[in-house]
Amino acid sequence: MNQTMEELWESSHMSAGHAGYLESLYETYLSNPEELPEEWLVFFKNLPIQPNSNGEISHKTIISEFKNIPRNSVVVKDEVDERQGKVIRLIQAYRNRGHQEAKLDPLGMMDRNIIEDLNIEFHGLTQDDLDEEFYTDTFITGSAKTSLREIVDSLRKIYCGTIGVEYNYIMESNERRWLQKKFESKLEKYNFSKEDKLHIYERLNSAEGLAKYLAAKYPGMKRFGIDGAESLVPLIDAVIQDCGELGANQICFGMAHRGRLNLLVNVLGKLPEDLFSAFDEKGTIEGSNTGDVKYHLGFSSNINTSGGEVHVSLNSNPSHLEIVDPVVLGSVRARQDRLGDKKRKKVVPVLLHGDAAFSGQGVVMESLQMSQTRGFNVGGTIHIVVNNQIGFTTSNKNDSRSTDYSTDVAKMIQAPVIHVNGDDPEMVVNAVKIATKYRNKFNKDVVIDLFCYRRRGHNEADDPSATQPLMYKKIASHPTVLNQYQEKLIQEEFLTKKEATIIKTNYRKSLESGISVAKNLSKNPNDSLWFDWTSYLDVLWWPKVDTTFPKKKFTNLGSKISSVPNSFKLGIQATKIFEDRKKMNEGVLEINWGFAENMAYATLLSESFPIRITGQDVRRGTFSHRHACVFDKEDGQGFIPLSKIAQAHNTRFDIYDSLLSEEAVLGFEYGYSATWPTGLTIWEAQFGDFVNGAQVVIDQFIVSAQHKWERLSGLVLLLPHGYEGQGPEHSSARIERFLQLCASENIQVCVPSSPSQIFHLLRRQAIRKMRTPLVVISPKSLLRNPQATSSIKELVDGSFKCVIDDSVEEKAKITKIILCSGKVFYDLNEQKNIKQKHNIALIRIEQLYPFPYDDLQEVLSKYKNFEEIIWCQEEPYNQGAWFSHRHRIQRVLDRFNDKKQIKLVSRPAAAAPAVGMMKLHLQQQTQLVEDALE
């Protein structure tokens, strides 16, 4: 298919300025081709040769001859061609920089410099050229040739009106041309019917009407309204309708508090009476739940569109701005995976941002960076920046960011940005039409930058004029978008003042009656569009769960995960690992951690539980223990044995190495797990120390979502932990922080110390219907410790033990009990045997929370003669489990009524988790073990 010159020009990185360079290369090719780089030699050799020609001729002689020809009438044509080129450059300048002169700010206070590139004089054209006709192709005016005056007028209407677009940094030329055509072709202009215009008006009225009603009914109470950004309501309404028309059946929204109440009532269909009850605090909070403020709560409903019914959900969120972004994306990916939506057209994520947060919060960049990765791609996100040009009290651009626009961060993934003036609601809806179609066609992110303002303070009780006196003086006299649009429709004779009054009156009556004011709500919603969580509610943690597995099936699966295709060439390390796994499966070798973990996945997959694992380096494992994916040493192709098992049992096994992010990736996995409870969702930290890079996700979602929003999640966190001389940044998963956050059985914290324990722990998490996050303090050195192994029998016939007793038989001779968790057990046990401390029993507490009071009591009751009991931990005194668990252990001891007190052996209190010198570490560890045993 032939390309036009314009298409070639648009797709090329070359320009007229490179012509001399190309000429010199060509002359070299003709005279001394051996001096050329190979790629240029190939290029010139492949140039087409005219049939019956004399071949290639040096241009130097031709140029010399032309220089000697007298200038004549050709000069006129040269001048015309030159001016034609100038017009093309002018057109391109508007495509590149027209947005910089667009009328985007409703208040007209935005600094807008005059862009010289957009003046005809800058390109060597004059006023005398305005009425001369030039070729434009058909993108601009609808005709091949038109006057410069009309060209400029069209360019200014398209690129410098109340909408501005940035897209010329996009590398894919087909995307650029598509966007260019959407904006420039008159055939693509969206004309609004009377019905369309009145619908927009009604939506604007609902936005302003609810804000005024709440202001009158609840003066001074925080509402975080969208006064000044009322066009957001018709914008969101258009997003839902357009996505539905394009074939989506689910839309997941994420947004902060500003405007949330308005969208809940006017778009999603929350009953006004329910909102008023929240203001009046008529509701009750049951049990240990805390609830949350009304502008953090989620909601869902089904809305009818021309393309069918769409399930719309708004995620609950904290006040921590933008942290909901990856959570929503994870939820969308889970829905797509559940539906088998490989093209990612059925479920659409829509994220609403504030301008200050979008440019300021790092999780935005992390979330954007995930957009085209294999493990986190959701087919493109529609971003809507509610750009009220102020963040609380900060409005000076020199304070809030270092870029021209708050949306410039989106350019890192080449997302097109459509800036639009919120006081032009029709153009706002136009922006939506382009954005939704772009996302649907290219499966990539797109940004709508809604320029607006904040009519009131950060909250309604705040006076913003103290810090922005000029802005709020301007706002005080600025008519609302509803009033402006009303006048426009009256002038166009689509609306009368009487009709406008009736619309406003009817809306207020609906509010007062408490009935729904949203449009197009489904009266009989299709319940197949959401997941039924009923079987996962009110499940207790303490009943025993059968995690055994038939041995014959076990060894059959073990053989499959230890094999690769005959033609597959494993490397030396992987070959050794797979050979050892075959021996473990045959009972020749004891089972190590890596094999046990992989077998946990294999057995669950064979029972049709889907599994998803992400994190940095998870396919191999940071410490080379997992090797869930192996690579052919000759062609580099990967092979995942567990995927074959998943396919055979009609389920999924997804394991992805993540980008180097903790916060966004953990947020994504939380969202995934909170949407699809059927299987096992796992996030592994490279080292447990790095989990605090995602502390906001832990605090605001993982440990508290159930009690704030009644949202369940079965997410598993694998956090490598252990004191092995690697310094303060590679030793501690900060157990103390997780334990401090434990309350009301909100999470599980476990420290498995053997392969059989991790096998049963992972199986328990999937099989048991309780969907509570599981924090696994996983080992590092134990992955290869020959003492940390298990038998096949322990895996196929055993269970997860919250407390593991000492194997000592003569318990009556025990006078001292050491309680511990994790790796330190093996250090203690080794020295205990060397020193023949037969009077000491080592008891491991493998589940730190919920604390196994009864299990510990049962074990301790076997020791009738112990005189001393201590808690031994590797961590410093002020860290680890001591402060959170000494009273729990003591509570168990008090049941025996013998007044024994738990004592501690640990490292001294320290500001950092561990020392940075191996020599000092070994000294400390030796002393710790000696103190515990003596």
Model-based region annotation:
Residues N2-E10, S15, I49, N113, ...:
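Thiamine diphosphate
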Residues M1-V363, L368-D399, I413-A415, K441, ...:
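Conserved internal helical-beta-strand scaffold that buttresses enzyme catalytic cores
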